[in-house]
């Protein structure tokens, strides 16, 4: 999972890859809340990172916050769960119909 994220800092200045111990704690929470497989998680993570690659990772969450992030009201949310749902629903991020052909 961690290796899918770029081995550099994001434009926000934070490392894209977080410490393994922090990720382990976040995944414990994730698996207690959601019923996804590691295969779903890897596919969803690759989809997420690939979406941001062309934008030089601008506004992308780091590996910890992608699993779970707590808002100011102490509510935990998971963008990873959203992307796992998209994988389960067969959603792709390829938007070829919006790309312009240049000849």
How should these model regions be labeled?
Residues 1-103:
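Append "and, occasionally, other polyanion-binding protein interfaces
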